A protein has these predicted regions:
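Cleavable N-terminal signal peptides of Sec/SRP-targeted secreted and luminal proteins
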Residues: 3-20
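Generic detector of short alpha-helix boundary/capping microenvironments
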Residues: 5-8, 156, 253, 293, ...
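C-terminus-biased signal that marks the final domain/tail of proteins
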Residues: 21-195, 208, 296-473
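Internal mixed beta-strand/loop scaffold within catalytic domains of large alpha/beta enzymes
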Residues: 184-291
Length: 473
């Protein structure tokens, strides 16, 4: 069995292309467009609501009537009012997600511990294990994952905004879970980053002239985490100690940072950037999921989001993709992918790929598509040796939108197993929409082999409809 942790370690290798043309696909891709499923558009206002002070929850169906996929049958959409401050926000969120949190939070870290140990001791993954910080490996092998995570919490806590610690304590109290477990859960991404695909298309690269941004999260499906998808929406700002912008985060119960998120004007996502941890990496800084959350919680343009990432005290090396409203482009739309580490931030735009990745021209890698309004990185080590995403971008340029990304790009590239999302911003600013997909099985109790998100139906939700659930009786 290959766990999500092992998948992350071996994602540093390039994925071999398939020479034969897949049915309904391009020759460089392993998957098939025929694997795609319909996109659902539920009426959120019509669902039964669970209400608590400062929050509301609806269960959004994941199972179309014409499919046999049965588990999970829904995902929780929790909308919380932040105007009472971080602690009350956390209490409301914890109350809304209590059952999910009690099942997930105490079990996630033990579930992953054995897989990390096996990966670190397996000679097949030895060189990839070296991409982990040496102090983490030492702490893990001596005292286990809890010790390694406690060290991470200690290193980052000084730089973690108090508002997030207060919200975490509120969540613990509201859900009835241990604060220490939440601290360890929220520290986990700092240790092992996921392999992902990022595509940001704007203007002439798209079918509508707006922005379509893909975030595909690849982490494997052998860990318990796949059973607990959550979408959380924050609305009703408290500018003194909380965000000033309504935003949505695709996450897991008790994970209060963000790795997939958007507001009405911009969206953000991340991908592992594998490099020697001794070079410009540190854990003495703000955990990157909280930096990502701050971008959509406080800012409304690509440029302001980029500047915030530059100004933050960063930790480990990651890619961060920010797309949406832009003050520097001719059409008011745009996006870029940041290569960030503890010391530097490099901006990859639609014109400078070969400056950012000069190795692309010297190592025999496939030619990366450079066209106006398009930036992307696939799930492999960059510069990628896999031509699938390049071929898909070339094939779909000028037609990119949520339907193409979900039903053509994702299943052919086989990316987005743990979750995937598309953020869309209308060219005229009239609508902002999120599409989300999650894994599932074809049995009622989740005991079967999970089907990756990229082969399941996605759900379309308008952000105004999401935020409106709080006031909709």
């Amino acid at each position: 069995m290959v766990s999500g942790v092992v998948v992350v370690l071996v994602m540093a290798t390039a994925i071999a292309s398939v020479s034969a043309t897949a049915a309904g696909g391009v020759s460089d891709c392993a998957g098939s467009a025929s694997d795609a499923k319909p996109i659902m558009e539920p009426s959120l206002a019509g669902f039964e609501k669970m209400r608590v002070p400062n929050g509301v929850r609806v269960n959004v169906p994941l199972t179309p009537t014409n499919t046999t996929v049965a588990f999970p049958s829904h995902f929780p959409l929790a909308v919380v009012d932040t105007s009472g401050g971080p602690y009350k926000t956390g209490v409301a969120l914890g109350q809304l997600l209590a059952d999910d949190a009690k099942a997930f939070v105490p079990n996630f870290i033990p579930d992953v511990a054995a897989e990390i140990e096996a990966a670190l001791k397996d000679s097949r993954y030895e060189k990839y294990a070296k991409l982990l910080p040496s102090w983490f490996i030492d702490a893990f092998l001596v005292d286990g994952i809890h010790a390694a995570l406690r060290v991470t919490v200690w290193m980052t806590k000084k730089y973690t905004p108090q508002r997030y610690l207060d919200e975490m304590q509120g969540f613990a109290d509201g859900a009835g879970v241990e604060m220490n477990d939440l601290l360890l859960l929220n520290a986990f991404p700092e240790l092992i980053k996921a392999a992902c695909t990022i595509v940001i298309a704007s203007g002439e690269a798209t079918a509508t002239g707006g922005v379509s941004q893909l975030r595909a999260l690849d982490f494997g499906l052998d860990l318990v985490v796949w059973k607990y998808p959550v979408v959380v929406a924050y609305t009703g700002s408290n500018a003194e100690d909380h965000g000033t912008v309504d935003f949505v985060s695709v996450t897991f119960p008790g994970f209060l940072g963000s790795i997939t998120g958007m507001n009405r004007n911009i969206g953000i996502c991340e991908k592992a950037w594998f490099m020697d941890p001794a070079k410009n990496d540190s854990r003495f800084g703000q955990p990157f999921p909280f930096t990502i959350r701050e971008v959509v919680e406080f800012f409304s343009t690509v440029e302001d989001g980029v500047q915030h990432v530059k100004d933050s005290r960063r930790t480990c090396s990651t890619f961060m993709g920010i797309g949406g409203r832009s003050t520097s482009s001719n059409n008011g739309l745009g996006g870029e992918i940041l290569l960030t580490d503890h010391v530097n931030v490099t901006e990859y735009t639609d014109t400078n790929y070969h400056d950012v990745f000069p190795e692309n021209q010297t190592k025999g890698t496939p030619e990366h598509l450079v066209r106006p309004g398009l930036v992307y990185v696939d799930k492999t080590l960059q510069p990628s040796h896999d031509n699938c995403t390049n071929a898909l971008m070339d094939e779909s340029y000028g037609q990119l939108d949520a339907a193409v990304l979900i039903q053509n790009v994702l299943p052919q590239a086989r990316t987005g197993d743990l979750h995937a999302a598309v953020y869309e911003f209308a060219a005229d600013g009239s609508t902002s929409t999120i599409f989300v997909g999650f894994p599932g099985t074809d049995d009622a109790d989740g005991s079967g082999k999970p089907i990756p998100a990229y082969q399941r139906s996605f759900v379309r939700m308008d952000l105004d409809a999401i935020f409106g659930l709080l006031s909709n009786k």
